[in-house]
C-alpha cells in the first residue's frame, strides 16, 4: 500500500483542511457518504473521475486498519 500521504492530502488552504484524495478536491468523506447510502464504489468513481480506483481502495484499507486497531478506543476518543 502506498504511504497515506500519497493518497490523502490535508492542506488548510484546500477545503479548510478537510482530508481530500491527493491531487483532487474530492473530500475523503464523500467516499464514505456514498457507501453509507448504498452507492457502489464504481458509481462513486463515475461521479468523481479524478479519484483513481486504487486510491479509493487504499482509503478503505486505511479505514479498515484503523477500526481493527487495538488503539481504536484511543483514536475514537481523540476525534469525538
Name what the model sees in each region:
Residues 19-22, 35-36, 41, 73-75:
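Surface-exposed beta-strand edges and their flanking turn/coil or helix-capping segments
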Residues 54-77:
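C-terminal structural segments of small proteins and small subunits
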Residues 1-25:
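N-terminal first-folded block
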Residues 1-4, 75-80:
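Intrinsically disordered, low-complexity and often Lys/Arg-enriched segments
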Residues 27-61:
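Amphipathic, hydrophobic secondary-structure cores in small proteins
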